[in-house]
Amino acid sequence: MDSFEALNKPPLSPPGWVFPVAWTILYILMGIASYLVLISGKPNKTALQVYGIQLVFNFFWSILFFKFEMYLLAFVWLVILWLLIFVCSVLFYRISKPSGYLMLPYLLWVTFAGYLNLYIALFN
């Protein structure tokens, strides 16, 4: 993380403490959303598969970005993650409207993360 602190960051980059707080809230909301889909009693296999796939993409983004410092590849990975989250949110919404809405903060945060990631990729 020392190398992250030394990066040229974008103007809207939040202080470091915001990230763990935001991710904690997001993971709670995502967990509730997936639980609502799971207990809905409606066909949910595809929605939960997409949910699982986007979680894997989320996990590996951190490795690409922080461990390997492959900022441009991480951005491309993040775009794919964003698309997966969008599809997941739509599928969740079709099964349980509240679960779809609970995914929106995650989608918005990853959109913001895309801005941060792209800036870092271009200016470092």
Regions found by a protein language model. Give the residues of each.
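Interfacial loop at the N-terminal end of multi-pass membrane proteins
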Residues: M1-V21
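Core segments of transmembrane alpha-helices
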Residues: W23-S34, Q54-F57
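Membrane-interfacial loop-to-transmembrane alpha-helix junctions, especially the N-terminal start
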Residues: P43-Y51
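Juxtamembrane boundary at the C-terminal end of a transmembrane helix
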Residues: G114-N124
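Hydrophobic alpha-helical segments of small multi-pass membrane proteins
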Residues: Y51-F59, F75-C88, Y106-V110
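Structural signal for the C-terminal ends of transmembrane alpha-helices
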Residues: S34-K42, S89-R94
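Membrane-helix boundary connector in multi-pass membrane proteins
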Residues: F65-Y71, V87-G100
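Membrane-interface loop-to-helix entry segments
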Residues: P14-I28, E69-L81
